[in-house]
Amino acid sequence: MPTEPETDYDPELGRKFIFVTGGVMSGLGKGITAASTGRLLKNAGFDVTAVKIDPYLNVDAGTMNPFQHGEVYVLKDGGEVDLDLGNYERFLDIDMTFDHNVTTGKTYQHVIEKERSGDYLGRTVQIIPHITDDIKRRIREAAEGNDVCIIEVGGTVGDIEGMPYLEALRQFAHEEDEDDILFTHVTLVPYSKNGEQKTKPTQHSVKELRSIGLQPDILVGRCSDKLDIDTKEKIGLFCDVPTEAVFSNPDVDDIYHVPLMVEEEGLDQYVMEELDIASEALPEDERENRWRDLVTQNTEGEVEVALVGKYDLEDAYMSVHEALKHAGLEKNVDVNVRWVNSEKMNDHHADRMREADAIVVPGGFGARGTEGKIEAIRYARENDIPFLGLCLGFQMAVVEYARNVLDLDDAHSAELEEDTPHPVIDILPEQYEIEDMGGTMRLGAHETEINANTLAATLYGGESCTERHRHRYEVNPEYIDDLEAAGLKFSGRAGNRMEILELGPEDHPYFIGTQFHPEFRSRPTRASPPFVGLLEAVLGDDPHTATTEEVSH
């Protein structure tokens, strides 16, 4: 399926597959390496998509703990997936679907359901061929309509959970033409105490990979600095790859510089030559350069943003961090995010919040830390600090307004306090009978109608927007009239559902909340309107009247 309405897909090229595995340890940056390769191929004129393989038994990431796993990223079709798919969407500027995330739980569930329905005609159902065949089918279907599909295998080579996937890739390589398959292995190259780059971990990792029947075509060394030529030659010799197939991916402060760095190494050109598509690439002077222009521009200032939440793992709010960074790219400023723990709103954290230029309260679940979020929202509202509330942040803004403006002292969300006498946030009607947790929220892209002559209309440049949702609760319709009579404007709606709230310019320079998650559609080259407006308010522009770049959401 094409990933975009307009595609550069050339069926005469056939489909090309790049498999990316990792060794030595997890968290090396396989996803960023893969996404950067895809970005460069897209710059060269190819239509590129990606698949992330997660070897866990969960069907999706929807019920995973953000403290341990990081954020749950939501796709346009409602798929709740690993945060790496967010990186692929941002780097490749595509909209992916749940089919682009392959999990062990999803695969096993499908095979078992087929067995129960008699599709296997009484045969013994086994890992090989039934599970491996299903894995290969999923990869091919996700790649349909694209020139290149990049498949990242989560985890580390040697993990028992990943064995069926590596076997499926071994079979896949035999079933496709040699020119259509490329194996990239990302591995750690640490320094010894005497400053020598050590290749032994890479050698052992490749040995493990080869024992499974896979020979890498490209090796990418993750190191604090670039690999020196002696290190590359040694890795090439002992791992049986040409020296020119060994590339560096050193540490950087900003992941958006990685495509530029691996381009300097010549990774993209080598990939195109190995896949026999170099002759089809755009000439270098005709390739997309906006990415390079954005990430290398000299910024003209700094903005301090307080992010008030309860998850102290930065990855739990990855898309919010990235959306703020994208807005900074558009406004040509550096955005420094100050973490404020909403569970510990002591003097230290309160001071960090008060010293910030703007306040963002992101989404989340559970009662812990909500009073700290409400306190932060009140501070922003009463002191004219630019404010953006997302999902739960939107709901807590309603609670704060009900308590401190409507004088409903005990107002709260029914999700967080079942016995509240004023449930200004209540469960969605269709959620009453639902008991299962996984995949049952209001999920995915939904259209919001925007009132004319509002802050939201100015930000989005039109009368509607389509953004991604992930929630079970909404503003209680019984309180809407009272809230609006007291000055809180609901400027965006989906039928009877309140989707956007704001205060007018006479009450606040920038106070807006969204029930949806605009951060999931933000891109480095196409920043999210509410985040751009937040920075405009800090920088002295009036987002209520400023002409922001119209974004097709």
Curated annotation (Swiss-Prot):
In the UniProt record, the signal sequence range is none
Which parts of the sequence bind UTP?
S26, K198, T199, K200, P201, T202, Q203, K234
Q: Where does ATP bind?
A: G27, L28, G29, K30, G31, I32, D84
SUPFAM superfamilies on file: Class I glutamine amidotransferase-like (SSF52317), P-loop containing nucleoside triphosphate hydrolases (SSF52540)
Kindly indicate whether the keyword Magnesium belongs to this entry: yes
Q: Where does Mg(2+) bind?
A: D84, E152
Q: Which reaction does it catalyse?
A: UTP + L-glutamine + ATP + H2O = CTP + L-glutamate + ADP + phosphate + 2 H(+); L-glutamine + H2O = L-glutamate + NH4(+); UTP + NH4(+) + ATP = CTP + ADP + phosphate + 2 H(+)
List every stretch annotated Amidoligase domain: 1-277
Q: How is the enzymatic or functional activity of this protein modulated?
A: Allosterically activated by GTP, when glutamine is the substrate; GTP has no effect on the reaction when ammonia is the substrate. The allosteric effector GTP functions by stabilizing the protein conformation that binds the tetrahedral intermediate(s) formed during glutamine hydrolysis. Inhibited by the product CTP, via allosteric rather than competitive inhibition.
Domain (Glutamine amidotransferase type-1) spans 307-544
- Give the binding site residues for CTP: S26, D159, I160, E161, K198, T199, K200, P201, T202, Q203, K234
Keyword Ligase tagged = yes
Name a single GO biological process: 'de novo' CTP biosynthetic process
Q: Which InterPro entries match?
A: Class_I_gatase-like, CTP_synthase, CTP_synthase_N, GATASE, GATase1_CTP_Synthase, P-loop_NTPase
What positions constitute the catalytic site? C391 (nucleophile), H517, E519
Q: Where does L-glutamine bind?
A: G364, L392, G393, F394, Q395, E415, R472
* Pfam families per UniProt: CTP_synth_N, GATase
EC assignment: the record states: 6.3.4.2
| Keywords assigned by UniProt, alphabetized | ATP-binding, Glutamine amidotransferase, Ligase, Magnesium, Metal-binding, Nucleotide-binding, Pyrimidine biosynthesis
Pathway it acts in?
Pyrimidine metabolism; CTP biosynthesis via de novo pathway; CTP from UDP: step 2/2
- Any one Gene Ontology molecular-function term assigned to this protein's record: ATP binding
- How does this chain assemble? Homotetramer.
- Other facts noted in the record for this chain: CTPSs have evolved a hybrid strategy for distinguishing between UTP and CTP. The overlapping regions of the product feedback inhibitory and substrate sites recognize a common feature in both compounds, the triphosphate moiety. To differentiate isosteric substrate and product pyrimidine rings, an additional pocket far from the expected kinase/ligase catalytic site, specifically recognizes the cytosine and ribose portions of the product inhibitor.
Task of the protein? Catalyzes the ATP-dependent amination of UTP to CTP with either L-glutamine or ammonia as the source of nitrogen. Regulates intracellular CTP levels through interactions with the four ribonucleotide triphosphates.
Record-stated family: Belongs to the CTP synthase family.
Name used for this protein in its record: CTP synthase
Query: What organism does the UniProt record list as the source?
Result: Haloarcula marismortui (strain ATCC 43049 / DSM 3752 / JCM 8966 / VKM B-1809) (Halobacterium marismortui)
Query: What's the name of its gene?
Result: pyrG
